[in-house]
Amino acid sequence: MEAVAATAVEFWDARYEGETYAYGTEPNAYFRQRLDALPPGRLLLLAEGEGRNAVYAAKRGWEVTAVDFSDEGRAKAQRLAVAQGVHINYQVGDLTTLAWLRPGRYDAIGLIYAHLAPADRQAVHAAAAASLAPGGHLLLEAFSPRQLGLPSGGPRTTDMLYQPAMLAEDFAGLALLENYELGVVLHEGSCHAGPANVVRLLATRDSNSELTYSI
């Protein structure tokens, strides 16, 4: 699997390099709502960016591991963590290499606007499912194809956008508790602002299920 293109890394480093947090410092609303209903444990956040969700979770008592390929994103996340008086384990790396894969390790995994090309998406989602501990939960929010044409953020190509049926297939080994599309109004910094169309998923790994993944 090829590593993330240098142009993508440069794009995200440029977006994160300023003092202002591009997506704000408050957690995603759906992530916060669902995480608050779970007992703290080990949490993995993929494509975590500037750390807003990681820092919130750490304040709630979670042991947080975050992964993103942007050094600038990590620097912003660490500054936010220090300001909020918490610690997060933030690793810089390419999600698509699956170096973060730890079968059965995490009590919760968050993918908040972790948009990937189809081949990479399927592999990353399968690895994320395998990294859940029995009884663990996976939380996802992403833009749907109906987001095209709206100025509130997201990829500009359909193949990078997610639909409930697609996610049901990707996470077929998990028990799906929620998987739906809806319209929302985003208030997440300057880069996620205004009316938007998103898909939300909450899934759990059954205690007796066997999910394996090898690189």
Model segments located where?
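Conserved class I S-adenosyl-L-methionine
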Residues: 1-38
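Short alpha-helix
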Residues: 159-181
